[in-house]
Amino acid sequence: MELFEYYKKRGKLKCLIGTGLFLYGLIGMYNTWGNINWGPVILIIIASLVFFCIGFWQLRKGNLLEKNIVKNDLTFLDIDTYVLLELPSNNKHLGLYTPDGRYVAGTKMISSTLPILKNKKVFGLEASDGEILAYFQSEVENYDWAIYDSNYNCVGMFKENMIQGFGMVRGSLMNEKEIKISEIEVEFDFFETSFHTMDDRILINCKRGYMPLEWSERFGLNVPIIKLGNNISNTEKIFGLGILLYILETIKVRKSRIFND
């Protein structure tokens, strides 16, 4: 999903919500005519206007991005810096974008479309041209997460520790031979985190809460910025990204449980 499509979809959704709230307010006024409680009605109308304004801004931003889109032939493995966005789509979950706003790849649920993966929770990293670059599968034997290349060869796993600290994810990075690479500990509200190889090279680095001014014109202020390590192989790039995606999704799920309890 290109960035302009992302903003257009979100803008349309906001406008629909604003329309729904406005109609709800009008219906409430009609049903209580002569004895209207203006407080809630005014709040509903204000909320609808806020959604309308945000939606209109996002639609306008999408149109501007579409006019100024820059295309090139770079592939996922040619790029080392990405911005990660949650996609407003049923099947696709996360999108990787270059700092100039070009969509490069995204995760999607694929186990439901392949009979061999029936009853398994498998995600694919799909390039913008539709090619599957990697597979990610949850709960594989004794591991919480396994990462595979495009030929479905295992490149590494992640196993969470039995004892988890409050507000963090702890676990071990394992290679395809089930040899421990390193231990990681990521807080739910981290500002910056990195994963390393056995020889202490950086696999991947992720920052939140910081956005260069030029990039902020295209993205939000608190979205993750991902930088792949230097001097690492393509397999290691897939592995590092797979682990990071698991950590971010786990943090999201566990934070929602905390707020819902």
Regions found by a protein language model. Name each.
Residues I116-I132:
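Acidic, aromatic-enriched beta-alpha/helix-loop junctions
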Residues D129-K180:
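Non-cytosolic head/periplasmic domains of membrane-anchored proteins
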Residues M1-N119, F166-R170, N175-D261:
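Low-complexity or membrane-interfacial segments used for flexible interactions
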